[in-house]
Amino acid sequence: MAWLAIVCLLAATTALCVRMAALAPGVYGPAVCGGRSGGGRGPPRHVMIFLGSGGHTGEMLRLLEVYGAALVAGATVRVGYTDEASAERGRQSAALRAARGVEYVPLLKAREVGAGAGAAVRSTVRAAAQAFSAVRRARRALHTGPHVVVLNGPGTSVVVLFWLRVLDLLSLRRTRVVYVESLARTESLSLSGRLAYPFADEFVVQWPDLAQRYRRARWFGALV
């Protein structure tokens, strides 16, 4: 019976590898912020964004000011946030007010600035557990799941991306993820950017040197 167990293990491993390959970035072509998941014109029907506090929130909101008509106008939007100040800034955003519907989803910070290693590990575990529940509910509430998820900034965005990919793997339905690196990163990627780089469908940088250094990065000029 040992041979049967080996065959079953090989079959399961092959199936898992095929599924992971099918969901790998680039298999379905580049994500287009203004497109629908099935082609056609107009904004995607379901969008999820993340407001990561402070300057990260400011950059995301400026991005929406410029590209909101293509991205969120008329769409259903889920807004993840880690502090109430970011949520309030989102509520004041003209771009988000143009959405068909907006729901704000509180998320825990993966790491507080200045936290020690032990505290950072504990906060990351708590944030990961809470983010899984939030991401799963977002996919369920949006029926077919977010067609585009736009992320930037701190570690919580990486946690969100991780759970999206886990759920993609389980459901064999890929969520398009666009990660926008901060304007402040001129010569190297942030830690969050380095972690997100292999898993984002579109990895956008705002300086040409970064686009030359990282093969999958795309540069469209300064977006914010």
From Swiss-Prot:
Lumenal side: 1-2
Keywords assigned: Endoplasmic reticulum, Membrane, Nucleus, Transmembrane, Transmembrane helix
GO biological process entries: dolichol-linked oligosaccharide biosynthetic process
Subcellular location: Endoplasmic reticulum membrane; Nucleus membrane
Cytoplasmic-facing ranges: 24-224
A GO CC annotation given for this chain: UDP-N-acetylglucosamine transferase complex
PANTHER family the record matches: GLYCOSYL TRANSFERASE-RELATED (PTHR12154), UDP-N-ACETYLGLUCOSAMINE TRANSFERASE SUBUNIT ALG14 HOMOLOG (PTHR12154:SF4)
Name the record gives this protein: UDP-N-acetylglucosamine transferase subunit ALG14
